[in-house]
């Protein structure tokens, strides 16, 4: 019996170590302990798969334009996604505020942050009008909470270098093709509205009322054939709402 004791002890120690290691792996696995964590990991992976340089040519085009037509500093920068990019009359509508339209593609908030130095900070704007986050929810599957957190990061970057710049967040506007995401849009708006209320020089522009009927239904006639982007009627309703907010 004495001859086999060391071997038995060794086997017992190996077995115990194996159980401990496996237990730690599965106990620490989000999939095993929290089903919702699996969804969070999946969303994070999709963000990681977004090429932050996919709009490099669009941003470069802005820089080429600036070289030919240097904009005045202290202006109002409109930055965000395709809602601004498709608004071809934006700079003319807000010419008296020195509007600079820096909307690009179907960008997300992380992409706006990525290019913030080149599309916002370099202009040293007096105001920044921000519209992004809808693609984060509709395309990346982000939650309203995540969108709010990312907007706070953007504010931190801008105010870190330009503390006297006013930042205006235009409320997330749900499109007909994204009605299934309406609850996350509402949650994001509620969180960002509260953040704007308590943060100096950060303001919330609510365009939701002009986009809906009295009974709450979305005015689908304000959107183009793709049922995603606004048409001229939609932009026309935004102009007085934005102008009123910027005048305060």
Regions found by a protein language model. Give the residues of each.
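Bacterial N-terminal signal peptides
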Residues: 9-21
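Conserved catalytic region of serine esterases and O-acyltransferases that act on ester linkages
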Residues: 31-58, 72, 198, 236-248
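Conserved SGNH/GDSL esterase-like catalytic core that processes O-acyl groups on lipids
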Residues: 44-153, 176-186, 190
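Sec-exported extracytoplasmic/periplasmic mature domains
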Residues: 117, 121, 133, 156-163, ...
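Catalytic His-Asp segment of secreted/periplasmic serine-dependent ester chemistry enzymes
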Residues: 174-248
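Signal peptide processing junction and immediate N-terminal pro/mature segment
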Residues: 19-35
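Bacterial N-terminal signal peptides that target proteins for export
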Residues: 1-11
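Charged, glycine-enriched surface loops/patches
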Residues: 147-170, 187, 191-202
């Amino acid at each position: 019996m004495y001859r086999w004791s060391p071997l038995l002890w060794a086997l017992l120690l190996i077995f115990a170590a194996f159980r401990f290691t496996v237990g730690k792996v599965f106990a620490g696995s989000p999939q095993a302990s929290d089903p919702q964590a699996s969804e969070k990991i999946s969303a994070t992976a999709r963000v990681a798969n977004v090429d932050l340089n996919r709009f490099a040519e669009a941003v470069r085009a802005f820089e080429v334009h600036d070289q030919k037509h240097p904009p005045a500093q202290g202006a109002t920068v409109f930055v965000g996604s395709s809602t601004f990019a498709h608004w071809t009359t934006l700079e003319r509508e807000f010419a008296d505020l020195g509007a600079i339209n820096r909307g690009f593609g179907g960008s997300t908030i992380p992409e706006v942050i990525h290019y913030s130095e080149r599309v916002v900070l370099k202009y040293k704007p007096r105001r920044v009008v921000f519209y992004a986050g809808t693609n984060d929810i509709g395309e990346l599957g982000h939650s309203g909470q995540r969108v709010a957190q990312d907007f706070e990061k953007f504010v931190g970057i801008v105010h870190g270098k330009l503390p006297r710049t006013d930042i205006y967040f235009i409320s997330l506007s749900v499109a007909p093709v994204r009605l299934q995401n309406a609850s996350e849009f509402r949650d994001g708006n509620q969180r960002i509205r509260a953040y704007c209320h308590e943060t100096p020089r950060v303001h919330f522009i609510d365009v939701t009322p002009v986009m809906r009927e009295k009974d709450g239904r979305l005015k689908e006639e304000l959107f183009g054939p793709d049922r995603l982007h606004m048409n001229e009627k939609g932009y026309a309703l935004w102009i007085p709402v934005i102008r009123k907010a910027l005048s305060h």
